[in-house]
Design a protein with these regions (language model features):
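Conserved small/polar residues in nucleotide/adenosyl-binding loops
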Residues: 125-130
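Long, compositionally biased regulatory regions of eukaryotic proteins
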Residues: 1-124
Length: 130
């Protein structure tokens, strides 16, 4: 069974009998395409983007919101499996976040992969607030 079928089975398990507002298989394919497009060669190493932003329609948010943690985990695991298959590395752990795009119609989504620096520990005692 390939990664996409495994992903699809896991997401179907999350939703159960509830009908998803769009195809998560298409979402996974879009995330993999964006990962491929945004992968950079850094010091001779193929470095995959570690931040994945999924924009959804405001109308879909109430139905999807309870599932965001599980969906984020499944998309993250899918992206990690795709990167491993291609021998890509990440700077840090991949992060998947959902955001509302008021311009999107119900049932539509967009995925953006971005290269970001690894998280740096911050000591809040050294922060100066304006």
């Amino acid at each position: 069974m390939n990664f996409l079928n495994i992903f699809e089975d896991h997401v179907a398990g999350i939703f159960g009998a509830t009908r998803a507002p769009f195809s998560f298989k298409k979402l996974a394919k879009q995330a993999a395409r964006d990962m491929e497009d945004q992968t950079l060669v850094i010091n001779g190493v193929n470095t995959a983007p570690a931040l994945y932003t999924i924009l959804i329609a405001a109308d879909d948010d109430p139905m999807l919101a309870p599932f965001y943690p599980e969906l984020s985990r499944e998309v993250r695991e899918f992206v990690k499996a795709q990167a491993e298959k291609r021998r890509y590395v990440f700077v840090g752990e991949p992060l998947v976040r959902f955001m509302i795009d008021p311009q999107l119609r119900a049932g539509k989504f967009s995925v953006f992969a971005e290269n970001v620096d690894a998280p740096t520990p911050v000591s809040y005692t050294h922060l100066t607030l304006p």
